[in-house]
Design a protein with these regions (language model features):
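A short, small-residue-rich loop immediately preceding and capping a beta-strand
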Residues: 83-105, 109-120
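Short glycine/serine/threonine-rich phosphate/pyrophosphate-binding segments
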Residues: 44-47, 97-103, 122-125, 244, ...
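Active-site segments that bind and position negatively charged phosphate/pyrophosphate groups
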Residues: 195-305
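Internal helix-turn-beta structural module
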Residues: 307-317
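Solvent-exposed alpha-helices and their adjacent loops that cap or buttress functional pockets
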Residues: 5-7, 30, 82-85, 106, ...
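A glycine/threonine-rich phosphate-anchoring loop and its flanking beta-alpha core
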Residues: 107-203
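ATP/NTP phosphate-donor binding region
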Residues: 1-89
Length: 317
């Protein structure tokens, strides 16, 4: 008798100070003894020695080791089928581009994917989809949830603050996304998975209630990353991005089309979340408090974005 739905979750989840030094140990524990590694632009100089030493000390064979700066689907398909047959895993170290590219390459080759984000700009490092260029258009394509997520909070801390603010914006967006999903079900436009709702709610509530003095506090960064990772699990349970992506994301996608220089995804989403929380009359005080207290609004004010641009896109979205 079928008793429930099978879901995937990461076998490795390590978030903390200094985890990059232990990447070899983590892979060895899963018997992932031969890997290919893709890194974002400039990251070999920054983290290459640390990663290679950890892998060598653990007896991990590195079959390929290169920087990667493409999300063109044709390039990634070629890349995927150039991966040596001896590879037991694909490791991506860096931001959204290299994470998405490595994730999709691993999916095509049915290999475990190890996600090692160097910033906390969104929940993409934990999601089972990849944002790629298909015929020149950004498209979300199916991939596979990461087998492992390894996040060094010291690395996250030293990244530019804009990436932390982007992660904050993406995290609070779960508030309006969940409202939209439940609203849709109530009006016959969808079906809510209650367990996915619970996980997504726990993720965002844990984050917004975290005490901190600075957004670079160890506890704050760990809660941000943990909550973003949980968001990816909520999507896996739901079988869609509904628990974490609603009207606020649609507004951001429309902005991407019209702005000459779009801002980071999480920045646009965070502003759109505040607007939609007011429209929904749902937890807008909490959203405003988080975005004010963290300095998100102050940072966004330096970017020259106009309120009307967001308001104009509500109808388009």
């Amino acid at each position: 008798m079928q008793t429930g739905k099978a879901i995937s979750i990461p076998s490795i989840l390590k978030v903390g100070n200094g985890t990059l030094n232990k990447i070899g140990e983590y892979l060895k524990s899963e018997e992932l003894t031969s890997v290919v590694i893709f890194m974002g632009n400039g990251l070999i100089d920054m983290f290459g020695d640390t990663i290679m030493k950890s892998l060598t000390d653990a007896g991990i064979t590195v079959l390929e080791y290169s920087e990667l700066d493409t999300v063109e689907i044709d390039d990634i398909i070629t890349l995927a089928f150039d991966i040596p047959n001896k590879a037991k895993a694909v490791v991506s170290v860096g931001g959204g581009k290299v994470i998405d590219a490595g994730k999709y390459a691993a999916f095509l080759r049915n290999l475990p994917f190890i996600s090692v984000p160097t910033s906390s700009s969104s929940d993409g490092f934990s999601s089972a989809s990849a944002s790629l260029l298909v015929h020149g258009k950004r498209t979300s394509v199916p991939a596979k949830l990461a087998h492992g997520i390894i996040v060094d909070t010291q690395v996250i801390r030293t990244a530019p603050e804009k990436f932390i603010y982007s992660g904050i914006g993406d995290m609070v967006s779960k508030i309006t996304a969940l409202y939209d999903w439940i609203f849709e079900e109530a009006h016959g436009a969808g079906v809510v998975n209650d367990f996915a709702v619970m996980v997504a709610k726990k993720a965002v509530n844990s984050f917004v209630r975290t005490p901190y003095e600075s957004i670079k506090d160890e506890l704050f960064l760990k809660e941000l990353v943990d909550s973003l990772a949980m968001s990816g699990i909520a999507n896996e349970i739901a079988g869609s991005s509904a628990p974490t992506s609603g009207s606020e994301h649609l507004i951001s996608h429309e902005l991407d089309k019209i702005l000459e220089h779009p801002q980071l995804h999480g920045i646009q989403v965070g502003i759109a979340t505040y607007i939609m929380s007011v429209v929904q009359n749902h937890r807008y005080v909490r959203v405003c408090t988080v975005l004010k207290r963290t300095g998100f609004f102050d940072y966004a004010a330096t970017l020259g974005m106009r309120n009307q641009e967001f308001l104009d896109q509500i109808d388009m979205a």
